[in-house]
């Protein structure tokens, strides 16, 4: 980050280059239209920056033209930093060359990072980028200068960290709180931010894993309890057990498990009733089919008996007709031939005819 600002500060400041840039015609290029909200954020860029941030935003995707209205880097050691801080955050920076310039180039680099962060917090728009203040601090401090750490649990560092969070979420003041102190305090505050941020993330990570582990254990225990309740009663026991006995056995269990078990019992009973009805229907059908076969065989036997009796009847009828034809002329001729009794007159008629024959 400091290297980018240094590169922006080393732009040519000769009058010839400034005149060339001012005479350059930009109207022949098409202008990319941006929404009003994006334009409002783009106008808040500090002059002299190239907007080449590692995080791509609608404004930073197209680098803005450099402005040479800022004071040249040769005017003083800390004038550039103080001027940019005054324009970005609205608060005057420390005077250049004063006792605040401690640490040489390293302190200046850290100050430039802090001023860049405070001036760009409106442009980054963490709500649109789904970023948190912790991510912004880590991106800025992690890519800059790393000094000696003075402890993660320092009260002043925690207070400054909370103040930075409030500023980032409220979208207000940039360098009022962070650039008002001397350089050495800002340097220590930045490193305290870094260490406290890492400690906070480490603690949050372990707490989240513990929470997930506890949730998994609780889910496993609930599944085991559910399996134990399901395996406690077999299907035959559920079907044969009375409602009163089942309610007595289910005391102490949750309502959802009791409802699930009773639904299973109702399903088993309905299934058993349907199976018994199906079995009874099949059994009755087999019985009726066997009776039908027996009746059909009896009908066939009766038909055969009827045919046999009809044939016997025809034979007797034919014999009777023969006897009747032969007995008619014998009766008319006299008593030379005894009358042969017909089959219909057998019995008492025959007993009557015997004395007549001998008489």
UniProtKB/Swiss-Prot annotation:
Residues 74-84, 210-224, 325-336 have a biased composition (Gly residues). Expressed in brain, lung, spleen, pancreas and kidney. In the pancreas, expressed in the insulin-producing beta-cells of the islets of Langerhans (at protein level). Also expressed in the eye. Residues 260-285 are annotated as: Basic motif. The modification Phosphoserine is found at residues 14, 49, 61, 65. It holds the Pfam family bZIP_Maf. Residues 181-209 have a biased composition (Basic residues). Residues 40-105, 172-226, 322-359 are annotated as: Disordered. Residues 260-323 form the bZIP domain. There is a cross-link at residue 32 (Glycyl lysine isopeptide (Lys-Gly) (interchain with G-Cter in SUMO2)). Ubiquitinated, leading to its degradation by the proteasome. GO terms for cellular component: nucleus. Induction: Up-regulated by glucose in pancreatic beta-cell lines. It is found in: Nucleus. The keyword Acetylation does not apply. CDD domains: bZIP_Maf_large (cd14718). Residues 46-73, 343-359 have a biased composition (Low complexity). Belongs to the bZIP family. Maf subfamily. Forms homodimers. Interacts with NEUROD1 and PDX1. May interact with MAFB, FOS, JUN and PCAF. Transcriptional factor that activates insulin gene expression. Acts synergistically with NEUROD1/BETA2 and PDX1. Binds the insulin enhancer C1/RIPE3b element. Binds to consensus TRE-type MARE 5'-TGCTGACTCAGCA-3' DNA sequence. This is Transcription factor MafA. It comes from Mus musculus.
